[in-house]
From Swiss-Prot:
It comes from Nitratidesulfovibrio vulgaris (strain DSM 19637 / Miyazaki F). Keywords: Methylation, Ribonucleoprotein, Ribosomal protein. One of its GO terms (biological process) is translation. This is Large ribosomal subunit protein bL12. Belongs to the bacterial ribosomal protein bL12 family. Homodimer. Part of the ribosomal stalk of the 50S ribosomal subunit. Forms a multimeric L10(L12)X complex, where L10 forms an elongated spine to which 2 to 4 L12 dimers bind in a sequential fashion. Binds GTP-bound translation factors. GO terms for molecular function: mRNA binding; structural constituent of ribosome. Forms part of the ribosomal stalk which helps the ribosome interact with GTP-bound translation factors. Is thus essential for accurate translation. The keyword Metal-binding does not apply. The modification N6-methyllysine is found at residues 77, 88.
Length: 127
C-alpha cells in the first residue's frame, strides 16, 4: 500500500467541486460522528448575540440630579425620601450636583424618582 501525504490529500480536496466537497464532508461527519456545522453555527450565533444588547430595551437605569433649581430645600427633602440619606448627606448630594441618586433601578422606579424631583424643582436625567 502506498503512503499518501497530507499535501496530496489537500490537493485532491482542492480540486473537488462544491457538490463533491459537500458529499465528502457528510461522509466524514457520519464516519467520525462529528458535525462540521456546529462551530460555524456557534460563530454565526455569536455575531447577532453581540449586536442584540444594543437593540434590547435597557432594564436598569440611573437617576442623576443635574441641578437643584430654585427650591433647594424641597429637592433635599425628596432626595432624603428617595435615598434614605440623612439631612447632611442629602444636602451634600444636592450641593454636589450633578450627582447620581439611584443606580441600576427599574424604569418605573427611575421615572417615579424623576417625577418627584422635577415636581420639587430639580433638573433630573435618567440614563
Amino acid at each position: 500500500m502506498s503512503s499518501i501525504t497530507k499535501e496530496q490529500v489537500v490537493e485532491f480536496i482542492a480540486n473537488m467541486t462544491v457538490l463533491e466537497l459537500s458529499e465528502f464532508i457528510k461522509e466524514l461527519e457520519e464516519k467520525f460522528g462529528v458535525s462540521a456545522a456546529a462551530p460555524a453555527m456557534a460563530m454565526v450565533a455569536a455575531g447577532p448575540a453581540e449586536a442584540a444588547p444594543a437593540e434590547e430595551e435597557k432594564t436598569e437605569f440611573d437617576v442623576i440630579l443635574k441641578a437643584a433649581g430654585a427650591n433647594k430645600i424641597g429637592v433635599i427633602k425628596v432626595v432624603r425620601a428617595l435615598t434614605g440619606l440623612g439631612l447632611k448627606e442629602a444636602k451634600d448630594k444636592v450641593d454636589g450636583a450633578p450627582s447620581t441618586l439611584k443606580e441600576a433601578v427599574s424604569k418605573e422606579e427611575a421615572e417615579e424618582a424623576k417625577k418627584q424631583l422635577v415636581e420639587a424643582g430639580a433638573e433630573v436625567e435618567v440614563k
